[in-house]
């Protein structure tokens, strides 16, 4: 075994003496070994795809079609179902074979990536510059770096267009807003108006505005992917064909660690945005698969008891609650008729099971008396008992049952994990940006290894 004191295992430019990094500093040792760094990245991609395939098959093996996905702790099958695979009206799973195929495809792909990663890490050339100049690079080569950036942008654009093609031509995607409680449909009438799509970016992120997270129809989502895909592809071509302008050469730090920090910063933003998207948005993340949003579960409870008490003879339009406000219905600050009780805070919720009961001025009393359909009652009762909550204090009036089934909503899992990961990536961004800027400014980075405690300790073996 190689330790700091036992240098018998030569690592060809990958030991602490030549790189300044010990083995546990990972890819930092490979900063200037493009071939070995390629191996590390391909192997990492293999691990990611292996997880996707294995977890996918694990979820398929444990899936019970009679129960909703969100009751089974699934996070991958909901994504496949949202893309329209294996589901029918109301989000009912009618065929699990596409999910099995997805798992196997990812597993096979991971084997190819794993082989490539091991090959480049152990057998392939240490550096690519001599043998394969097209794939070689030097971190300071600004033109080459923007070419690599361009290639990445084109790949991202192609990915965006894959979703467009699936939605428009290849079977469509699941639309939670389809009449009668959701269905798979082709998205034909795409929104391509820049004023609508870029208007989302100009919205406030707070309250009912909700920035891009307020998108509530698939036409806007898929049309937005047409724009994003086009921007990424044209931007990629631009970056391949051009060299950085003088202001860009001056503004950025051009080193491997700087690029790492930029990437971590971008991924941090993605993580925080994904957190908000999966928590609040029930169009991109349909409640049939991910469970209701918090506001949705709260409003569903108010609706469920309105239905019950109306059947028992209550006058839902005039009954007063304990505060003197309407017990079942009240008016919002702007005059709309909304659900009464603690759920008033969520009065601007929009959900497919509730919208048919609205009129021009909020909830329509006549529709609530005459038009409620059985599927709306069933769905709201289901959502009421599956709130994505675990709170010590008030939860918007939702009756949380501590002795109930062991249930954690996929929305809770996905929102929490992406917030935590987004935060860690942000810290990593600050850390690596600080190191990269220090190195560029020419002063010492990191801690002085001469006084590092581990150097005075006895070797492990």
Swiss-Prot record:
Q: Where are the transmembrane segments?
A: 57-81, 122-143, 166-188, 243-263, 279-300, 435-459
What is the membrane topology noted in the UniProt record heading this document? Multi-pass membrane protein
Cofactor, free-text remark: Binds multiple chlorophylls and provides some of the ligands for the Ca-4Mn-5O cluster of the oxygen-evolving complex. It may also provide a ligand for a Cl- that is required for oxygen evolution. PSII binds additional chlorophylls, carotenoids and specific lipids.
Q: Name one GO cellular component term.
A: chloroplast thylakoid membrane
* One GO term of the biological process aspect: photosynthetic electron transport in photosystem II
- Sites where Phosphothreonine occurs are at 3
Propiece residue ranges: 1-2
GO MF term (any one): metal ion binding
The yes or no answer to whether the keyword RNA-binding is present is no
Classification via Gene3D superfamilies: photosystem ii from thermosynechococcus elongatus (1.10.10.670)
Residues with the modification N-acetylthreonine, per the entry, are 3
Instruction: Show the Pfam families listed in the entry.
Output: PSII
Q: Which family does it belong to?
A: Belongs to the PsbB/PsbC family. PsbC subfamily.
Query: What job does the chain carry out?
Result: One of the components of the core complex of photosystem II (PSII). It binds chlorophyll and helps catalyze the primary light-induced photochemical processes of PSII. PSII is a light-driven water:plastoquinone oxidoreductase, using light energy to abstract electrons from H(2)O, generating O(2) and a proton gradient subsequently used for ATP formation.
Quaternary structure, per UniProt, is:
PSII is composed of 1 copy each of membrane proteins PsbA, PsbB, PsbC, PsbD, PsbE, PsbF, PsbH, PsbI, PsbJ, PsbK, PsbL, PsbM, PsbT, PsbX, PsbY, PsbZ, Psb30/Ycf12, at least 3 peripheral proteins of the oxygen-evolving complex and a large number of cofactors. It forms dimeric complexes.
Tell me the protein's name.
Answer: Photosystem II CP43 reaction center protein
* Species assigned in the record: Psilotum nudum (Whisk fern)
Q: Which gene encodes it?
A: psbC
């Amino acid at each position: 075994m190689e330790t700091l004191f036992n240098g018998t295992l030569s690592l060809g430019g990958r030991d602490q003496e030549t790189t300044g990094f010990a083995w546990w500093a990972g890819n930092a040792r490979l900063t200037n070994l493009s071939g070995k760094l390629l191996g590390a990245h391909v192997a990492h991609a293999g691990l990611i795809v292996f997880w996707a395939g294995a977890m996918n098959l694990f979820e398929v093996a444990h899936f019970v079609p009679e129960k909703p996905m969100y009751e089974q702790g699934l996070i991958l099958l909901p994504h496949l179902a949202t893309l329209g695979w294996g589901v029918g009206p109301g989000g009912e799973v009618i065929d699990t074979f596409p999910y099995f195929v997805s798992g196997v495809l990812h597993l096979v792909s991971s084997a190819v990536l794993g082989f490539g990663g091991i090959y480049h890490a152990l057998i392939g050339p240490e550096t690519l510059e001599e043998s394969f100049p097209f794939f070689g690079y030097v971190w300071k080569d600004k033109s080459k770096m923007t070419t690599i950036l361009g290639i990445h942008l084109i790949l991202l654009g192609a990915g965006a267009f894959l979703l467009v093609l699936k939605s428009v031509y290849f079977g469509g995607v699941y639309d939670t807003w389809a009449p009668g409680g959701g269905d798979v449909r082709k998205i034909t009438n795409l929104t391509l108006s820049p004023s609508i799509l870029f208007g989302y970016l100009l919205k406030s992120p707070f309250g009912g505005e909700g920035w891009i997270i307020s998108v509530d129809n698939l036409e806007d989502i898929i049309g937005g992917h047409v724009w994003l895909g086009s921007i990424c592809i044209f931007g990629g071509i631009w970056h391949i064909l051009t060299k950085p302008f003088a202001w860009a050469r001056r503004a950025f730090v051009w080193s491997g660690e700087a690029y790492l920090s930029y990437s971590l910063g971008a991924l941090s933003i993605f993580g925080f945005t994904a957190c908000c998207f999966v928590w609040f948005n029930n169009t991109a993340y349909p409640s049939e698969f991910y469970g209701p949003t918090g506001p949705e579960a709260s409003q569903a409870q108010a609706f469920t008891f309105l239905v019950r008490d109306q059947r028992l003879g209550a006058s839902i339009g005039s009954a007063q609650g304990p505060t003197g406000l309407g017990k079942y219905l009240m008016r919002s600050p702007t005059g709309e008729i909304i659900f009464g009780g603690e759920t008033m805070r969520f009065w601007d919720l929009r959900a497919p099971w509730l919208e048919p009961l609205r009129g021009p001025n909020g909830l329509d009393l006549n529709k609530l008396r005459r038009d409620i359909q059985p599927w709306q009652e069933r769905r709201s009762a289901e959502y009421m008992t599956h709130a994505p909550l675990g709170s010590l204090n008030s939860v918007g009036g939702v009756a949380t049952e501590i002795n109930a089934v062991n249930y954690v909503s996929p929305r809770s899992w996905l929102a929490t994990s992406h917030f935590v990961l987004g935060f860690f990536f942000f810290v990593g961004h600050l850390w690596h940006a600080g190191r990269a800027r220090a190195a560029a400014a020419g002063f010492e980075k990191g801690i002085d290894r001469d006084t590092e405690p581990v150097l005075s300790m006895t070797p492990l073996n």
